[in-house]
Amino acid sequence: MVGRTKDYFSKQSKAYQQFRPSYPQALFDFFESLLPDGAIIWDCAAGSGQASVHYSDKVACVIATDQSDKQLAHAPAHPRVRYAQSMAEVTPFPDHSVDMVTVAQALHWFDFDAFFPEARRVVRPGGVVAAWTYSFLDVTRALGTEIDAAIRSFYYDVIGPHWPPERRFVDERYTTIPFPLAPIEAPQISIEVSWDLDGVMGYLATWSSVQRYKDAGFDDPLPEFRRMLEAVWPSEEVLGPVHWPLALKIGRT
């Protein structure tokens, strides 16, 4: 029996929608170059729609699913996006009914042995499956090595023991996830944002390990960490670019 994909984000779904970075338009332009006009996309584990709403009208419809109704409740309305609650590994979709399956920052939570057969069933022959992740934010250009070292210490030393085991796939940039599809070469793409301290702290609040730290009975670690960052934060109110290189796995069925 297929189990539910682990849900580490419903409790912070509002912060997730507000502070998780958006993906660059270059990513969606690349995807559209692989698709026919009038394509249908299944955006699986869509969260609050971070990757669902950025396609041109070349794409007729995006069906954005997530097992968390709390996440979907914060997704933005869009005329070509239909939101629905569904697991990743078992869906109500007809056979060969979509042209592409996308998974943004979520594949590592899935039951791989169940998801990939379901994706093959749902996507049309020769269709595309794409999954991508971003791991540790690079702040050295914007904020310098001192703040980078502080965030890394928070990541590994303070909340490190509370990361779910699947997080290792992200740190390994998806290189150790089996991907049983004919690979497509992808360009190098990075997320870039300009953030103030509130933006950085809001993003950290969306981490699954922060929620698990609190669920384990510890006090919220973020207020103390914020005070430490405030002591070394540059005088400029907004700094950038903060960036994350994307690791993209993409292939055809």
For every predicted segment, state its role.
Residues 1-37, 50:
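Conserved class I S-adenosyl-L-methionine
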Residues 31, 55, 119:
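Class I S-adenosylmethionine-dependent transferase superfamily signal
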Residues 42, 48-90:
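Class I SAM-dependent methyltransferase SAM/SAH-binding core
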Residues 89-100:
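A short acidic, Gly/Pro-enriched loop at the edge of an enzyme's catalytic core
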Residues 103-104, 112:
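A short beta-strand submotif of the Rossmann-like class I SAM-dependent methyltransferase core
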Residues 110-118:
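A short, conserved alpha-helix within the catalytic core of class I
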Residues 120, 124-193:
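Conserved catalytic/acceptor-binding region of the Class I
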Residues 170-253:
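Conserved Class I S-adenosyl-L-methionine
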